[in-house]
C-alpha cells in the first residue's frame, strides 16, 4: 500500500501520479485523508484525556488523606467519565484506522516517473526487438491445428474434464511442457542465480492481499469453498501466480541488509477465473483458466530496485533467445500497468500462426508497495533503521503462450516440429514427429 506519510505530506503529488493511470483512483485520496485525520484527532484527544485522568487520579489520594471525602468521590466520578470517553475515542480511532486502511488497499501504486503517459496498450512504447519473424516456404499451421495433428493437446477432453479453458496435454505435448518447465528452472537457478522453491498451490487471503491481488481482484480468483477444515472455507484460494506465495515468504520478517537481494524462482500451475474473448484465443491456448508458469521474485535494496528490474527482464529474454524465438520488449504506459506495479516491462513473443505478438512475460518493480502490505522490512546496517525493500516479480516465463510460439515457429514442411537445441536433452529428441 502507499505510505500514509507520503499521502499527508505530498497530497497533490500522489493525486497527480494516480491520475496518470486514468482509473479515477485519485478521488479516494480525500476520503483516506479524512479518515486519517479523524483517527489522529481521536488519538490526540484521548492522549490529552489520559493525562488529565492521571493527574486527577493523583488528586484523589490527597483528598482522601485530608478527609475531603465528598470532593474525592466527585473526582472519582470525573475519572470514570474520562475513562468512558477515552474508551469511546479509542474505538473511534480504531474504526477510522480500519476504514482508512481498507480504502488504502484499494488504491494502486504510483507509476514511476520514467513510465510513459498513456491510456491503454496502444500507448505502450516499444523498447527493443530481437530476431526476425519466422518465414515459411509452405503454408504454416496455427497451434490448434498443430496440436491436433501431432496429438499434443486434446482440447475436447480437456473441456470434458473441467469445462472450457482447461487443457489436456498428451504424449509429446505433455513431454514438451515438462521439458520447458525443467529448462526454465535450470536456466534461472544455474545461470541467473535464483534459488528454486516449490510453493503451495493454495494460499491464504493474507498472501493475496500482500501482493495486491485482493481486495480489488477477488472476483478473478478460485476460492476453496468446501473441505474438512470449515474455518478456512472461503479464505483459501488457488494461486493465480506463484508470486502470491513466493513474494510472501518473508512477510512479517526483518531481513539483514547483507541478505539482499533475495532471488527466488518457482514453478506452479496458475488458476484464473477471468474469461477470455471469443474465437481462436478461447478455443486454443491463448486464454485459459489454468496454465503453467515459472515465476521470478526479487527482494532488493531500494537503491538497486531498477537495476535489478533490468536484470530480471534480461533473464526472461534469455529464455526466448535460447529457444530461437522472435520477440519484442515494451514498457507499459501509466494506463496499462498492473495494480501493484510502479514500472513494468512486457515481453511479447511472435506467434506466426496467430500473426500477432503474445505476452509471455511481465516484469515489474513494485517498489515498497507490496512490502508495506506484508510488513516485510530489512535493517539498514549504517543506522539500524528498519526499511521497506523493493519487491520485483516477473514471468520467467508463462508456458501456454510460449508453447504456442514454439510449435508455430519451429514447425517444418513435413508437419513435424523441430526441437530447439536447449530442449533436446530434456525431451530426448530433436524432432516432434507427426502422430501415427
Q: Positions of the model-derived regions?
A:
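TRNA-recognition modules of translation machinery and tRNA-sensing kinases, especially anticodon-binding
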Residues: 129-436
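N-terminal alpha-helical targeting/anchoring segments
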Residues: 1-134, 152, 156
Amino acid at each position: 500500500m502507499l505510505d500514509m506519510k507520503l499521502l499527508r505530506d505530498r497530497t497533490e503529488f500522489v493525486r497527480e501520479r494516480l491520475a496518470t493511470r486514468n482509473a479515477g483512483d485519485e478521488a479516494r485520496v480525500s476520503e483516506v485523508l479524512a479518515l486519517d485525520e479523524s483517527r489522529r484527532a481521536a488519538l490526540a484527544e484521548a492522549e490529552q484525556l489520559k493525562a488529565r485522568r492521571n493527574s486527577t487520579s493523583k488528586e484523589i489520594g490527597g483528598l482522601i488523606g485530608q478527609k475531603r471525602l465528598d470532593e474525592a468521590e466527585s473526582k472519582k466520578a470525573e475519572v470514570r467519565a474520562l475513562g468512558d470517553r477515552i474508551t469511546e475515542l479509542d474505538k473511534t480511532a480504531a474504526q477510522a484506522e480500519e476504514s482508512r486502511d481498507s480504502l488504502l488497499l484499494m488504491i494502486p501504486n504510483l507509476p514511476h516517473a520514467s513510465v510513459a503517459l498513456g491510456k491503454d496498450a496502444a500507448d505502450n512504447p516499444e523498447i527493443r526487438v530481437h530476431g526476425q519473424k519466422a518465414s515459411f516456404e509452405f503454408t504454416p499451421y496455427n497451434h490448434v491445428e498443430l496440436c491436433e495433428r501431432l496429438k499434443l493437446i486434446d482440447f475436447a477432453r480437456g473441456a470434458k474434464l473441467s469445462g472450457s479453458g482447461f487443457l489436456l496435454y498428451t504424449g509429446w505435448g505433455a513431454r514438451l511442457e515438462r521439458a520447458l518447465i525443467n529448462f526454465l528452472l535450470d536456466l534461472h537457478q544455474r545461470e541467473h542465480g535464483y534459488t528454486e522453491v516449490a510453493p503451495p498451490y493454495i494460499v491464504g487471503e493474507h498472501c493475496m492481499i500482500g501482493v495486491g491481488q485482493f481486495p480489488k481482484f477477488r472476483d478473478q480468483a478460485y476460492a476453496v469453498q468446501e473441505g474438512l477444515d470449515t474455518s478456512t472455507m472461503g479464505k483459501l484460494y488457488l494461486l493465480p501466480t506463484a508470486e502470491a506465495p513466493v513474494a510472501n515468504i518473508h512477510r512479517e520478517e526483518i531481513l539483514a541488509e547483507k541478505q539482499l537481494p533475495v532471488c527466488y524462482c518457482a514453478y506452479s500451475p496458475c488458476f484464473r477465473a477471468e474469461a477470455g474473448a471469443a474465437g481462436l484465443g478461447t478455443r486454443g491456448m491463448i486464454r485459459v483458466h489454468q496454465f503453467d508458469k515459472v515465476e521470478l521474485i526479487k527482494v532488493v535494496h531500494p537503491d538497486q530496485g531498477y537495476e535489478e528490474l533490468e536484470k530480471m527482464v534480461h533473464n526472461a529474454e534469455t529464455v526466448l533467445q535460447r529457444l530461437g524465438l522472435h520477440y519484442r520488449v515494451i514498457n507499459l504506459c501509466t494506463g496499462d500497468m498492473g495494480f501493484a506495479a510502479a514500472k513494468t516491462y512486457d515481453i511479447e513473443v511472435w506467434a506466426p500462426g496467430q500473426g500477432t505478438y503474445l505476452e509471455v512475460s511481465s516484469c515489474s518493480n513494485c517498489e515498497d508497495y507490496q512490502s508495506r502490505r506484508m510488513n516485510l522490512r530489512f535493517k539498514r546496517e549504517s543506522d539500524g533503521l528498519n526499511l521497506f525493500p523493493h519487491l520485483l516479480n516477473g514471468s520467467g516465463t508463462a508456458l501456454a503462450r510460449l508453447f504456442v510460439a514454439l510449435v508455430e515457429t519451429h514447425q517444418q514442411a513435413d508437419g513435424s516440429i523441430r526441437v530447439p537445441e536447449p530442449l533436446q536433452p530434456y525431451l530426448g529428441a530433436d524432432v516432434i514427429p507427426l502422430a501415427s
